[in-house]
C-alpha cells in the first residue's frame, strides 16, 4: 500500500520525462524567438529581414505545437487519475514500430507567360519562397529561395529527416511566398516607431519614446499577429502519406491556395517533384538477440549447434559468439524473416528439456525448415513475441519494409565552387515511366577528376613508340660485335692525337675496276670544312645502317660476349675470321682519292699526265 501511495505522490508532484523534454524544447524556442525579435529591430536589408521573419514564423509554429502537446499530456494524466483503472485499458494493443521519413530534392515548376519570361530581366519582380514541413510534433523548414521570372522552377536542396514517424503518418508541406518589391518591406518596427514619433508633436513624441524604451521590444513586436511590412502568405500545400513513399523521384499534385491577384502570387504548374523515402525501425534496429540452439538431423542422429542470434533487417543472423558482431564478421547462418515466413512452436522436447520452434521459408517452390530451441520457456516466449511484433511491423509499413531505402542525411549548406550549378528545369526529372535525375557536366568533370587523380585536367599523355635502338639500353640483351677493321680514333683524345698526325699519309689511288669507298676522317683540311653538310648526312645514314645491323643481330641467338682485343691483335683476329668464313671473302673498303688543290688542278703537267 505504501508503494502505491509513493507512486501516486511521485506522479502528482514530479512531471514525467516526456514532459520535461517538451518543456526544454519549448524554453529553447522561446529564447530563439527573443533573439530573432532583437535581430528584426536592427535589420536593414531585405533578405535579412525576410529570413528573420521566416525563422520567426517557424519558431511560433513550434511554440504552439509544444504548448498543445503539454496540454494534451496534462489532460491525459488527469483523466488517468480520476477515470478508469489502468487494467481496463487495452495493454495488449500492438503499435507498429516508428521509423524515419526523409524528403529531399523538392522542385516546383513555374508556368510563366512568354511575355513575362522573356521580358526585361532588370525590372522583373522577385519573390521570397520557402517550405514549412510538419509531421506530428516535428516542424522543419527549408532555405529561403529568391524567385524571379527567369527561373523555370523552384528548387530546394535541403534533406529533411523526421526521426520518429509512425506508419500512419501525415507529412504536410506548406509553400509560403512574399513579394520582395513591396515598398513597406523595409519598414522594420524600429523605423516605424521612429516615423510615428516624428509624425506627432514634440512633447507627445518624447512621451511615446519614453514609453517605448520602458517596455520590452518583443511586446511591441508581437502586438499584432503578423509583422508589419514583410509578411509570408500560404501559396500551396500538399499532404504525404505512406502510399506516397517511393525510392525514387516522383511527381505529386499540389493544392494551390493563393489567388492570382495577390502580391505573393506565383504561376505554379500545379505539381511538384521530390524524393520521399522511409526507413522502418524493424529494418534498421535490432529487435531481439540471444542464444538459440539449431537442431539438425545428421545420419539419423539429432545434433545441436549453439548460435548467438540477432533479429535485424528482416533476417535472423546467427553468429557463433557475440564478439563477431563487433568484429563485423559475416554471420554463419542467415534465415530470412519476411511476410512469407511461417513460424510455429514445436513444443517441449523431453530429451533436451527445451522449447523449440520452426522457421519455414519457401525457396524455389519448396519449403525449407529450420528448427531452433531456446534454453527455457521464458526465452521462447520472448522470441515468439519478437517475431509477432516483427510481422506486425512489416504489415503496417507495407512496401517500405520490403527493401531498405537509403537516406542521405548530409546536405552541405555551402557546396564547393565546382559543384555549384544553376537549378535545371524540373521537366528533366518529372518522368512518369522511369523518373531519374540527370547528371550535370560539372558533376561528370568532378567525378572524372576524382577517378583519374587529377590527370583528367592535364589531358591524356600519348606514349610514343620506342625507337628501334632503345632495346640496346634496357639491359636485357647481350651484344657481341665482331670488328673487322680498326676503330677510328678521335682527334679530341689528347693521348691519340699525336699518333694520328704521325701516321697520316696520302692514300693510293683506287683501282680502275673498284668503286671508291667514302670514309669520314676528322681533320683540319679546309676542304673538309666546305663539305660539312654533306658529311653530316652521310653520318646519319651510316648511323641508321649500323643500328639496323645491330637490331638484326639481336634477333639471332645470343652468344657470350667477348672482351675486345687490343689494337695490336686486331690483325690476328681478322685472319682467323677469314679462315672461318672459307669461301666467303669480305670485301675490303677502298679509300677515297685525295681531293686535289686548286694549284694542282691548274698545273699543265697534270693535264698531260691525265691525257697519257
Curated annotation (Swiss-Prot):
Residues 483-530, 574-612 are annotated as: Disordered. It comes from the Eukaryota. Pfam families: Anillin, PH. Keywords: Coiled coil. Coiled coil: none annotated. PROSITE patterns: PH_DOMAIN, REM_1. Residues 3-79 form the REM-1 domain. GO terms for biological process: hemopoiesis; positive regulation of cell population proliferation; signal transduction. Residues 285-392 form the PH domain. Residues 486-498 have a biased composition (Low complexity). The keyword Mitochondrion does not apply. The keyword Coiled coil applies. This is Rhotekin-2.
Amino acid at each position: 500500500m505504501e508503494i502505491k501511495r509513493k507512486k501516486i505522490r511521485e506522479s502528482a508532484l514530479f512531471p514525467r520525462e516526456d514532459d520535461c523534454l517538451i518543456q526544454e524544447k519549448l524554453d529553447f524556442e522561446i529564447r530563439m524567438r527573443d533573439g530573432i525579435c532583437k535581430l528584426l529591430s536592427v535589420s536593414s536589408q531585405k533578405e535579412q529581414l525576410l529570413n528573420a521573419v521566416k525563422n520567426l514564423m517557424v519558431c511560433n509554429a513550434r511554440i504552439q505545437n509544444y504548448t498543445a502537446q503539454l496540454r494534451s499530456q496534462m489532460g491525459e494524466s488527469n483523466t488517468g487519475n480520476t477515470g478508469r483503472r489502468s487494467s481496463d485499458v487495452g495493454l495488449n494493443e500492438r503499435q507498429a514500430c516508428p521509423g524515419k521519413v526523409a524528403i529531399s530534392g523538392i522542385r516546383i515548376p513555374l508556368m510563366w507567360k512568354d511575355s513575362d519570361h522573356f521580358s526585361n530581366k532588370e525590372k522583373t519582380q522577385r519573390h521570397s519562397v520557402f517550405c514549412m514541413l510538419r509531421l506530428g510534433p516535428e516542424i522543419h523548414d527549408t532555405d529561403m529561395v529568391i524567385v524571379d521570372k527567369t527561373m523555370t522552377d523552384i528548387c530546394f536542396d535541403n534533406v529533411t529527416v523526421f526521426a520518429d514517424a509512425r506508419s500512419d503518418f501525415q507529412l504536410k508541406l506548406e509553400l509560403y511566398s512574399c513579394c520582395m518589391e513591396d515598398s513597406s518591406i523595409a519598414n522594420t518596427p524600429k523605423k516605424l516607431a521612429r516615423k510615428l514619433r516624428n509624425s506627432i508633436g514634440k512633447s507627445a513624441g518624447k512621451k511615446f519614446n519614453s514609453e517605448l524604451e520602458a517596455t520590452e521590444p518583443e511586446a511591441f513586436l508581437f502586438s499584432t499577429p503578423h509583422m508589419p511590412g514583410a509578411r509570408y502568405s500560404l501559396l500551396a500545400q500538399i499532404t504525404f502519406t505512406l502510399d506516397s513513399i517511393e525510392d525514387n523521384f516522383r511527381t505529386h499534385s499540389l493544392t494551390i491556395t493563393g489567388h492570382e491577384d495577390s502580391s505573393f502570387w506565383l504561376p505554379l504548374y500545379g505539381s511538384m517533384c521530390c524524393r520521399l523515402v522511409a526507413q522502418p525501425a524493424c529494418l534498421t534496429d535490432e529487435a531481439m538477440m540471444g542464444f538459440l540452439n539449431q537442431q539438425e538431423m545428421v545420419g539419423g542422429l539429432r545434433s545441436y549447434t549453439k548460435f548467438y542470434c540477432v533479429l535485424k533487417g528482416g533476417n535472423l543472423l546467427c553468429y557463433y559468439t557475440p564478439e563477431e558482431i563487433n568484429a563485423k564478421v559475416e554471420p554463419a547462418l542467415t534465415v530470412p524473416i519476411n511476410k512469407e515466413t511461417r513460424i510455429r512452436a514445436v513444443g517441449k522436447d523431453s530429451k533436451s528439456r527445451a522449447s523449440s520452434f520452426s522457421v519455414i521459408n519457401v525457396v524455389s517452390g519448396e519449403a525449407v525448415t529450420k528448427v531452433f530451441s531456446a534454453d527455457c520457456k521464458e526465452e521462447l516466449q520472448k522470441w515468439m513475441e519478437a517475431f509477432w511484433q516483427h510481422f506486425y511491423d512489416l504489415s503496417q509499413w507495407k512496401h517500405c519494409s520490403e527493401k531498405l531505402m537509403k537516406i542521405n542525411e548530409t546536405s552541405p549548406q555551402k557546396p564547393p565552387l565546382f559543384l555549384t550549378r544553376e537549378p535545371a528545369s524540373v521537366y528533366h526529372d518529372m518522368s512518369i515511366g522511369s523518373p531519374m535525375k540527370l547528371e550535370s557536366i560539372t558533376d561528370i568533370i568532378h567525378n572524372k577528376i576524382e577517378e583519374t587523380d587529377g590527370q583528367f585536367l592535364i589531358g591524356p599523355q600519348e606514349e610514343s613508340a620506342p625507337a628501334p635502338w632503345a632495346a640496346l639500353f634496357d639491359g636485357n640483351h647481350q651484344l657481341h660485335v665482331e670488328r673487322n677493321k680498326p676503330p677510328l680514333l678521335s682527334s679530341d683524345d689528347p693521348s691519340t692525337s699525336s699518333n694520328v698526325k704521325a701516321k697520316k699519309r696520302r692514300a693510293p689511288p683506287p683501282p680502275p675496276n673498284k668503286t671508291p669507298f667514302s670514309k669520314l676522317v676528322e681533320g683540319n683540311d679546309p676542304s673538309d670544312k666546305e663539305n660539312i653538310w654533306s658529311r653530316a648526312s652521310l653520318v646519319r645514314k651510316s648511323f641508321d645502317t649500323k643500328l639496323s645491323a645491330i637490331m638484326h643481330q639481336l634477333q639471332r641467338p645470343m652468344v657470350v660476349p667477348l672482351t675486345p682485343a687490343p689494337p695490336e691483335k686486331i690483325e690476328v683476329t681478322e685472319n682467323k675470321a677469314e679462315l672461318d668464313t672459307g669461301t666467303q671473302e669480305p670485301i675490303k673498303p677502298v679509300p677515297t682519292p685525295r681531293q686535289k688543290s686548286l694549284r694542282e688542278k691548274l698545273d699543265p703537267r697534270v693535264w698531260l699526265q691525265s691525257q697519257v
